[in-house]
Every structure is written in C-alpha cells, then in structure tokens.
Amino acid sequence: YARSSIGGSKSGRSLLKRDARYDVLLEQVAIGPLTAKNRFYQVPHCNGGGYRDPSAAAEMRAVKAEGGWGIIFTEQTEMHHTSEITPFIELRLWEDQDIPSLRRMAEKMKVHGALAGIQLAYSGINGPNFYTKEVPLAPTALPIRTFTNDPVQARAMDKVDIRNLRRWFVNASKRSRTAGFDLICLY
C-alpha cells in the first residue's frame, strides 16, 4: 500500500492506495496438508525468556497472532538435556513435563488463525551444558564454541550417539505434536 496524498484525508487519517503487486502476500498458501492464511512467516527467534519465563514468550507470539501473521514459530527449543546453552536461556522440550507451557504457547499462536511452529534444536558443538554437566556431543572432538570462552571439550559422536540423536528428535517431534504445534523445524 502507498500513501495517495501527503496531507491525508480531511479526517486526519492517511489515505492508502492498494498496490496489487503485494496482494500475493495476503493469499493463502498450502504447506502439505495445512493451509496458512497468508504468507507472513515469523521465523524462529529468541526473546530471552525461554524455559524460565515461557509465559513472556507465549504472550509475545500472541501479539504476532493478533497482528495477523500466517505462520508463527517459537524460538530455538532445546530438545535434549545434552544440548543446553547456559548461560543463554531457551525454551526446552526435554521431557513430557515441558509440554504444558509449550501447549499454552501453541494455543496463543493459533487463536487468530495462525499456524504454530516449533524449532527443535540440538546445539552440539555450541552447547557447553553448564547446567546439566553432560559431556557435549558433536561431529568431532573439538572445543565448544561458547561466547564465554570457558574450556569445554566436545566428545565426537559415534554411531550409537547418532542413533540416539535421531531418537531424541523423534521423541521431541512427538511431544511437539502433543503440545499442539502444526509445523516443526529441525535445527
């Protein structure tokens, strides 16, 4: 939309003229068996509340839903306790007890017709596990790339670890569906 006059209307509101080039943004789009009400897609991004204050993250996404977004995603969500990035705070979906707070978030995303998405993450070489004290797992045995320069060393994953990682993603995906999410992004 573009302003049709600099001064606006007599009522003091700006007059907007429709620009047909942008109509495609307001069209529905099919994603597999689902349909998004428009093409406005809120990518996964953190707000700092994470598991400590999931209600703040839910309310932030509720505002986006009210604003008319077609697809709204959570922030990066840790899906296993061997992949946490303390001191940074993210959402968690380690076990079933994490489902209720994420269910509330999915419900708030959907209240105005948006599709709710969750990003499931395994931080690997970026996860120092300061909270859980687990030895980090990564493709290779290298120092963890933290922002705090702490001396943490990753263990190279073997075939058993890779099978476990796949199982952890499957379990987290099932929990995501139970929580009411429509879309899942693996990271």
Regions from the language model: what does each represent?
Residues 1-123, 130, 154, 165, ...:
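N-terminal capping/small domains of soluble enzymes
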Residues 69-80, 136-144, 183-186:
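Short coil-to-beta-strand
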Residues 116-118, 177, 184-186:
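Active-site regions of oxyanion-processing enzymes, predominantly non-cytosolic
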Residues 121-181:
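Non-globular sequence segments
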